[in-house]
């Protein structure tokens, strides 16, 4: 919340998974309930930012109504990396199961989703930058206010268990770039005391990262 806008970074896994994937991932499907608990109705979301278009990050972009996928947040403008959409269309053997077009194609066709190539300011104080590794075009989302910085680093550092630059995931398409870009991130995030948000950590949603010699640690905020 900026005081003028309600901005949602990522929409999670959604409620459109087929039964096989539901058994695997066991989604709780609580996003809308949680938003209402915070006093925000879906109609009050102004901006939605998808760091990339894997189904677990954009699943609640849309919901099914009368058999068609429509915007979950009808008054929002959605933003996503253009390169992500282009890659998803290729349906490569390596990662085609991660891209489910009902999560984004209806929004592109309706003009509600803007695809952006590269870095951009989304709204004053909130910008996106390409940080490759997990995918080629994945964004990190930066929130800057009163001289301080918070960063939703997405799947470049998905949890606090992945702080060590060499601990990549099997899902990472470019693990050597994960290594290089984590080091590049730490070179600024640690001395400048950025608050880092971890998208997949069930216990630590955000923290400050520290380094001593070659060991990395975190201090929960």
What are these regions (language model features)?
Residues 1-33, 37, 140-155:
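Conserved beta-strand hairpin/beta-sheet module of binuclear metal-dependent hydrolase folds
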Residues 7-9, 49, 78, 150-152, ...:
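Residue-level marker for buried hydrophobic side chains located in beta-strands
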Residues 11-14, 53, 83-84, 133-135, ...:
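Active-site metal-binding loops of divalent metal-dependent hydrolases
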Residues 26-40, 44-56, 72-130, 135, ...:
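Metallo-beta-lactamase
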Residues 59-68, 208-209:
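Metal-dependent catalytic neighborhoods of phosphoester/phosphodiester hydrolases
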Residues 119-171, 178:
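Glycine/small-residue-rich hydrophobic helix-like segments
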Residues 147-148, 157-221:
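Accessory terminal helices/loops
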């Amino acid at each position: 919340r900026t005081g003028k806008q309600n901005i949602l970074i990522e929409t999670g896994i959604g409620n459109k998974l087929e039964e096989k994937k539901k058994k695997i991932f066991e989604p709780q499907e609580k996003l809308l309930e949680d938003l209402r608990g915070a006093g925000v109705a879906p109609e009050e979301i102004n901006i939605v930012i998808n760091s990339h278009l894997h189904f677990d990050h954009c699943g609640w972009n849309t919901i099914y109504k009368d058999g068609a996928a429509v915007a979950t947040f009808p008054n929002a403008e959605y933003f996503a990396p253009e390169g992500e959409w282009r890659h998803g269309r290729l349906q490569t053997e390596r990662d085609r199961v991660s891209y489910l077009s009902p999560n984004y194609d209806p929004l592109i066709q309706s003009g509600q989703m803007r695809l952006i190539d590269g870095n951009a300011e989304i709204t004053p104080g909130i910008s996106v930058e390409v940080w490759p590794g997990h995918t080629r075009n994945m964004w990190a989302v930066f929130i800057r206010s009163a001289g301080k910085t918070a960063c939703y680093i997405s799947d470049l550092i998905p949890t606090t268990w992945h702080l060590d630059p060499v601990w990549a995931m099997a899902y990472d398409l470019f693990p050597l770039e994960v290594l290089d870009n984590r080091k590049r991130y730490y070179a600024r995030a640690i001395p400048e005391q950025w608050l880092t948000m971890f998208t997949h950590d069930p216990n630590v949603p955000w923290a400050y990262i520290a380094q001593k010699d070659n060991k990395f640690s975190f201090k929960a905020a």
